[in-house]
Amino acid sequence: MPSIKQCSFCGKEIPPATGLMYIRNDGSILWFCSNKCKKSMLKLHRDPKKLKWTKSYIGGK
């Protein structure tokens, strides 16, 4: 049975047969729920703790 994965950027659960799998040169596997998460992490190098729409967001200052 396929397992439910978790997005490497926002922390959202990814249902089976959906999402994007990215494999780095060192062999580590990253799962993304959307192209928005993939671009934010890999291309734009954003910190998920600073974005309100992620589960790891830290509010306040």
UniProtKB/Swiss-Prot annotation:
- The record lists Zn(2+) as bound by 7, 10, 33, 37
- So which domain of life are we looking at? Archaea
Q: Which SUPFAM superfamilies match?
A: Glucocorticoid receptor-like (DNA-binding domain)
- On whether Zinc-finger is a keyword of this UniProt record, the answer is yes
Question: Membrane-crossing residues?
Answer: none
Q: Which Gene3D superfamilies match?
A: Ribosomal protein L24e
Q: Give the required cofactors.
A: Zn(2+)
UniProt entry keywords in alphabetical sequence: Metal-binding, Ribonucleoprotein, Ribosomal protein, RNA-binding, rRNA-binding, Zinc, Zinc-finger
Q: How is the cofactor bound?
A: Binds 1 zinc ion per subunit.
InterPro entries, per this entry?
Answer: L24e/L24_sf, Ribosomal_eL24, Ribosomal_eL24-rel_arc, Ribosomal_eL24-rel_N, Ribosomal_eL24_CS, TRASH_dom
State the Gene Ontology BP annotations.
Answer: translation
GO CC, sorted alphabetically, is: ribonucleoprotein complex; ribosome
* GO molecular function (one): zinc ion binding
Which residues form the C4-type zinc fingers? Answer: 7-37
UniProt keyword rRNA-binding, yes or no: yes
Task: Relate the assembly described in the record.
Answer: Part of the 50S ribosomal subunit. Forms a cluster with proteins L3 and L14.
Q: Function, please? A: Binds to the 23S rRNA.
Query: Which NCBIfam families does this one have?
Result: PRK14891.1-1
Question: Which family does the entry's similarity section mention?
Answer: Belongs to the eukaryotic ribosomal protein eL24 family.
Q: What is this protein called?
A: Large ribosomal subunit protein eL24
The record lists the organism as Sulfurisphaera tokodaii (strain DSM 16993 / JCM 10545 / NBRC 100140 / 7) (Sulfolobus tokodaii)
- Gene name of the record: rpl24e
